[in-house]
Each structure stands twice: as structure tokens, then as C-alpha cells.
UniProtKB/Swiss-Prot annotation:
The chain crosses the membrane at residues 33-53, 77-98, 113-133, 178-198, 226-246, 288-308, 320-340, 347-367. Heme 1 (or BL or b562) is low-potential and absorbs at about 562 nm, and heme 2 (or BH or b566) is high-potential and absorbs at about 566 nm. Its main location: mitochondrion. It comes from Crossarchus alexandri (Alexander's cusimanse). Heme b b562 binds at residues 83, 182. This is Cytochrome b. Its cofactor is heme b. The keyword NADP does not apply. Heme b b566 binds at residues 97, 196. The gene is MT-CYB. Binds 2 heme b groups non-covalently.
């Protein structure tokens, strides 16, 4: 008689996805981040659900309802800080996951990669709307500045911004709809994540060598479940250290001041995980040009499969491409730092140079290095 996990219609799906899944024998810790993202998503949905029970999406009471959650609700403070810092962990795992995909050539699984880009955009939209909800100074002004970027679209820009705002400025209507979208989007993300997994399990996982491992696969459990649990415990430990010891480390002090439309903060900036894109936006003096560069900074991921010129899939044995990859990582860290600095000399020129380098590495240098490496292999 077959085991229940192999014959029950529902348990069978779980079994084929997480237990008996044929997995390459040589995947490293870099393959952990997919499951960590799943855990982050569940954590965010659960903590968000409890926060939504006490939060009110009204401009008059939003700020005080967050204060009420932290002061009066049982363990409200820890739920709120797990949710806020959980978003940061989510993005750390996201960036690592995308970086892993770029390094090991996982972008050649086109369907999985494109769903991943869609997921990235959806998560970014969700995080942005969540940042607006506490209705502090930076929430309000961040929402005003970022949504106002759409006014750069010719002809329909101004009408589009007013339509999103639900009026002539960021106000009650904006906050209410942002809360509604922030609540529903994580469930859409969950559905997209299932599609992402579906496409991945259609092709099987990539591995560090970039060579097919079909003849040599091993079951996911117990070999990789142990590794996943270690990664999970490490991430949860880091998250809880952050939550308990310095919960406001990654936040903005201005958000402890209630939103005031009459008083602009000296330096408006989004959360840290958007700073690299914000720096690219600010590095172009023209408004429409800046918005296009902002969108392209993420959309450029969609054309990476077309820019793959190497005969090898992975960067494991490609030293030139490795140097460029780590230069790209350093460049992104520089952009993140610049995004948090005021718009003045020397930060303006550093931001512009870093933005040019970002696009140059992906569009020009990476394809050239792949071609050079192909030639070197012939020697």
C-alpha cells in the first residue's frame, strides 16, 4: 500500500513540491532565500492581519491608532516592529535571491524569471503603500513625492495623479485606498509565488555549476530541509535581534511626527530598500527622464536573458564576469548610500556616476565580458 503522502490528492502536491522533489546535489546556501521569502510573506500577512484589527485608515486617527497599537494592545509593539522590520528582511532576502539568479544564470529559466520580476514590482508597490499608512511626516511626504512622479507622463500625468490621490492632494481618500491595496496585495503576491514555484518545478532548480544535473538528483527531504531550517533560524534570529534591540534602526525619525501638509521635512526619502532606485531617479535633472530611469533600473532585469553571451550559464568559472558582478553590488550599495544623502555637492556627481555605471555594467560590460571569456576558452 502506497504512503498517504503519495496518494492523497492534496498531500501529493505538497510531497512533490517539498519532500520528494528531485534536487541538484550541489546547491548551496544561496538557494535558501526562496523559502525564506515564503516565510517572510507568511510572517508579514499574519502580523499585518493583527495590525489591521486595530488600525484605522483615517487621516485624523491613523497616527494615534498606531500609537494605540504600540502602547495599549497586548504585545502590539512587537507585532508592529516585526511587521516593519520584517519588510526589511523581506527585501534583504529579495535582493539576495535576485543576485543569486544573476550570478548563477537562473534568468535563463525565462518564465520563472519574468514572474519573479512581476513579484518584485508587486512587493515594492505593497511596501511603498505600507510605508504611507502610519501617517507620519515621512509617510505623507514620501507618498506625495513618489505619486507626484506620475505627473511627468505627457498629457495624462496630472489627471492620473489626481485619480490616484482621489482629490487634489494626498488626503483621506488616498490613505483609505492605500490601506485597501496594502491589505489585498500580499494575497496576490502569494498567488504569484505559487505560479513562480510551478514554473520552477517544471524545469527543476539550477545549480552552482550551471550544468544539467538531471542524472544525479537527490530528494529534497531530508538533505535540504535541514539546510532550510538552519537558514530560517538564522534569519529569525537576526530579525528578532533587530526588533528587540534596535527596532527603529531602519526607520525614519520623522515618522514619529504626525503628518503635516504645511511643514515639509528638510530631506524627503523613502525606506532604505528603495534608496538605490531613488538615487537613480534624482541623478537625472529632467523629471520624465528620471521616472523612466527609475522604472528601467528594475525593468532592466527583464532583458538580462537577452544579454547573456557566454557559452557557460553560471559565473562560477568566469572571473571577468565575477569582477563585474561584485562591482555591480558595490555600485548598488553606493547608490543606496547616495539616495539617503541631501542633494548637494559631491553627492550629486557621485550619484550620476554610479547611475551611469549601473546601466553600463548590465547593458555593455557584462555581454562584452561573456564574449571575451568565450574567446579565452578557445586558446
Amino acid at each position: 500500500m502506497t504512503n498517504i503522502r503519495k496518494r492523497h490528492p492534496l498531500i501529493k502536491i505538497v510531497n512533490e513540491s517539498f519532500i520528494d522533489l528531485p534536487t541538484p546535489p550541489n546547491i548551496s546556501d544561496w538557494w535558501n532565500f526562496g523559502s525564506l521569502l515564503g516565510v517572510c510573506l507568511v510572517l508579514q500577512i499574519l502580523t499585518g492581519l493583527f495590525l489591521a484589527m486595530h488600525y484605522t485608515s483615517d487621516t485624523m486617527t491613523a497616527f494615534s491608532s498606531v500609537t494605540h497599537i504600540c502602547r495599549d494592545v497586548n504585545y502590539g509593539w512587537i507585532i508592529r516592529y516585526i511587521h516593519a522590520n520584517g519588510a526589511s528582511m523581506f527585501f534583504i532576502c529579495l535582493f539576495m535571491h535576485v543576485g543569486r539568479g544573476m550570478y548563477y544564470g537562473s534568468y535563463l529559466f525565462m518564465e520563472t524569471w519574468n514572474i519573479g520580476i512581476l513579484l518584485l514590482f508587486t512587493v515594492m508597490a505593497t511596501a511603498f503603500m505600507g510605508y504611507v499608512l502610519p501617517w507620519g511626516q515621512m509617510s505623507f511626504w514620501g507618498a506625495t513625492v513618489i505619486t507626484n512622479l506620475l505627473s511627468a507622463i505627457p498629457y495624462i500625468g496630472t489627471s492620473l495623479v489626481e485619480w490616484i490621490w482621489g482629490g487634489f492632494s494626498v488626503d483621506k481618500a488616498t490613505l483609505t485606498r492605500f490601506f485597501a491595496f496594502h491589505f489585498i496585495l500580499p494575497f496576490i503576491i502569494s498567488a504569484l509565488a505559487v505560479v513562480h514555484l510551478l514554473f520552477l518545478h517544471g524545469t527543476g532548480s539550477n545549480n552552482p555549476s550551471g550544468i544539467s544535473s538531471d542524472s544525479d538528483k537527490i530528494p529534497f527531504h531530508p538533505y535540504y530541509t535541514i539546510m532550510e531550517i538552519l537558514g530560517l533560524l538564522t534569519m529569525l534570529a537576526m530579525l528578532m535581534i533587530l526588533v528587540v534591540f534596535s527596532p527603529d534602526l531602519l526607520g525614519d525619525p520623522d515618522n514619529y511626527t504626525p503628518a503635516n501638509p504645511l511643514n515639509t521635512p528638510p530631506h524627503i526619502k523613502p525606506e532604505w530598500y528603495f534608496l538605490f532606485a531613488y538615487a537613480i531617479l534624482r541623478s537625472i535633472p529632467n523629471k520624465l527622464g528620471g521616472v523612466l530611469a527609475l522604472i528601467l533600473s528594475i525593468m532592466i532585469l527583464a532583458i538580462t536573458p537577452l544579454l547573456h553571451t557566454s557559452n557557460q550559464r553560471s559565473m562560477t568559472f568566469r572571473p571577468l564576469s565575477q569582477c563585474l558582478f561584485w562591482l555591480l553590488v558595490a555600485d548598488l550599495l553606493t547608490l543606496t548610500w547616495i539616495g539617503g544623502q541631501p542633494v548637494e555637492h559631491p553627492f550629486i556627481i557621485i550619484g550620476q556616476l554610479a547611475s551611469i555605471l549601473y546601466f553600463s555594467i548590465i547593458l555593455i560590460f557584462m555581454p562584452i565580458s561573456g564574449t571575451i571569456e568565450n574567446q579565452l576558452l578557445k586558446w
